[in-house]
C-alpha cells in the first residue's frame, strides 16, 4: 500500500505526524488516492456484503423509485404530511425550502474540500488519538472492523470542540484556520436550528405535538438535549469504482441525520420488495434527511431507519457532510406508543444510545438486526 506523504516530511521520520498516526494504531495508513492507477486488493469490496448484490434501480417513468422531495418552506399541513409519508415509506428524503442559503452551504463545502486537499502530514496532525473517542482525522473505529478498506477519507468532530480540534491541523491559528472554523460553526448553527424545526414537524406528523399532547413533554426534552456530531467525508475519484465502496451499507444509530452532499451523486438508499439501491440525486441546495435507529424506536417503528451506502465516481471527487443528531448518552429512548402500534403497545424496549450501540457492536458481521434484538416479543412469539 502506498502511503500519502507531503514533500516536506518523510513518513518514516520520527517527527512525521503521519508516522505517529500509524504508530498509535488509531489512524490507518492512507492510500494515495490521488495517484492511484488501479484499485489495490485492500480496497476491493464489491460483493462482500449481501446488500451489495442488490441492483441499482433505474429511474422509472412513474417516479416509483424517485427519492421523495419535501419542501418545508411553508411549514403547513401539506409539508408535515409529506414528511410523514417519506419517513414511513422510505426512511429518507431530500429536503428543500429549509432556509439555509445556498451561499452558506457552498462555503462549508468549499472549506471541507480545502481541508482534504491539505498535505497528508497536515491532516495527520488531527489524527484520531487513543482514548480520543470518535474525534479526529482518519478511519472511524467501527470501519476498522471490516476486512476491506473504504475508498474515502474522513474527519469527525463534535461542534463545541471545533476551534480546539482544528488547532491541531492549523497550529498557527492563521486566516485559513479562522475561515474553516467560522464556516463549520455556521453549518452547526444552521443544522441545529433546522433539526429543531424538523423535530417539531415529525412530532406534528405523529399527532403528538404541543405541550398538552401525549408526546409534548418528550419533544421538549429531546429538543433541549439534542447532541450533535459532524463528519466530513471525501470520496476521491476512483479508476475502477465498481470494485470499491465509499461507505459500506449501514443504518445510522441516532435520531436523524442531515447530509450535505456535493452535486456529484453517490449516496444510495436501499428499497425492498425487491431489494434495490436508489441513488439520491445531487440536487443543488437540497439536504438529505436519513432516519436513524433510535428514532425508529422512539416512533414505535412508524418512521423507519434506512440502509444507505456511498459509491464513488470515476471522474470526480465527492464531498459529503453528515450532521448527526441524537439523544444524550444517559437518556432512555422510550417508544411513543401512540405513534406507531395500532395495538397501543410498545414494539421496542426502552434503551439508551450506549446500550443500543453495545447490541449493534455484538452483532457486527452477522445478518441479525440490532432492532430485532430489542423488539418486544409478541404473545404469539412467546407461546411458539
UniProtKB/Swiss-Prot annotation:
Keywords: Dioxygenase, Iron, Metal-binding, Oxidoreductase. Expressed in unopened flowers. The keyword Nucleotide-binding does not apply. It catalyses: gibberellin A20 + 2-oxoglutarate + O2 = gibberellin A1 + succinate + CO2. One of its GO terms (biological process) is gibberellin metabolic process. 2-oxoglutarate binds at residues 318, 320. Its EC number is 1.14.11.15. Its cofactor is L-ascorbate; Fe(2+). It comes from the Eukaryota. Pathway: Plant hormone biosynthesis; gibberellin biosynthesis. InterPro entries: DIOX_N, IPNS-like_FE2OG_OXY, IPNS-like_sf, Iron_ascorbate_oxido_reductase, Oxoglu/Fe-dep_dioxygenase_dom. Fe cation binds at residues 250, 252, 308. Catalyzes the 3-beta-hydroxylation of the inactive gibberellin precursors, leading to the formation of bioactive gibberellins. In vitro, converts the precursors GA20, GA5, GA44 and GA9 to the corresponding 3-beta-hydroxylated bioactive products GA1, GA3, GA38 and GA4, respectively. Involved in the production of bioactive GA for vegetative growth and development. May possess 2,3-desaturase activity, catalyzing the conversion of GA9 to 2,3-dehydro-GA9, and GA20 to GA5 (2,3-dehydro GA20). This is Gibberellin 3-beta-dioxygenase 1. It comes from Oryza sativa subsp. japonica (Rice). The lineage of its organism: Eukaryota, Viridiplantae, Streptophyta, Embryophyta, Tracheophyta.
